[in-house]
Amino acid sequence: DPLGQSQVLPYIIGLTKAGYSFHLVSFEKPDRYNENRLTIEAICKENSIEWHPLKYTKRPPLLSTVWDVLKMRRISNQLHNKHGLSLIHCRSYISALIGLSFKRQKGIPFLFDMRGFWADERVDGGIWQLKNPIFKWVYGYFKKKEVHFFRESDHVVSLTKAGKNEIMSWDEMDDLGPKISVIPCCV
């Protein structure tokens, strides 16, 4: 979602009013960024949110995502070195790659805000054709990572009770109930 149309800003604005501070790293498509930049900058400044927009890359498929992950890792390291991050809130799977690595390497708590079963959604939506061996490998990679995200995160946010129940139905996941909260988009 473009940052201006997502639930992210209202969510963290509420938390800043409770005394928390944020560095928000987002990937923005150039046209949307140019259209909304001044508004989002003003909202962030007014609420003491440090926004770090990065350019979203789409092509070539897969390699562009690897490039975006590298950019995210670099800025996350810079922010941690300068400010000493105390929690990383990862909205979806790509950012969770960074959150999990920071948890493992630096001991920083990691909140996994899953949104949905991303790898399955890519397959169900026809974006990843499992007949293609590369997409089949990427799908398997993220399904394995998904288990690590659930197991190793300090807390998980699911959009639905059905999502939470699905996770808890998997082998060796039935004990995760207390660390999974359901927060629908409409909240």
Where do the language-model regions lie?
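N-terminal subdomain of nucleotide-sugar transferases
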Residues: 1-53, 83, 155-157, 161
